[in-house]
Amino acid sequence: MARRGDTMSIVIIGGNDRMICQYKKICKKYNCKAKVFTQMIPKLGNQIGSPDIVILFTNTVSHQMAYCAVAEAERNNAEIIRCHTSSGNALNGILEKVCGL
């Protein structure tokens, strides 16, 4: 896990396609670097990398994506945060707790 003041690496799995730019903007506000995957892509596990945190928006993610993301997070000892809603406010709340800004 990154120390306070360092840039945290976050992967967001699920959510809405039209919100990708907003998710990244919100993460930037909390000094976090974000990768966002709203749809299943080939070799998703390789694309995830080794983030500090994986956020799963469970309402908008396929089971296949969720299983792949959780497996990669566990393999890299990343924290997994599950959230049912995929709104910007939900992401703000998660990052507020994690980053403490």
Across the structure, where does each feature detected by a protein language model lie?
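Short glycine-/small-residue-rich Rossmann-like dinucleotide-binding loops
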Residues: 59-60
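An anion/phosphate-binding loop that grips the pyrophosphate of nucleotide cofactors and donors
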Residues: 51
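Cofactor-binding loop segments of dinucleotide-utilizing enzymes, especially the Rossmann-like FAD-
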Residues: 13-15, 39, 85
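Short, charged N-terminal beta->alpha structural module
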Residues: 8-31
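Ser/Thr/Gly-rich flexible loops in soluble cytosolic domains mediating phosphotransfer, phosphorylation
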Residues: 74-101
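A short, well-structured beta->alpha microelement
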Residues: 32-47
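Short, Lys/Arg-enriched N-terminal segments with co-localized hydrophobic residues
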Residues: 1-7
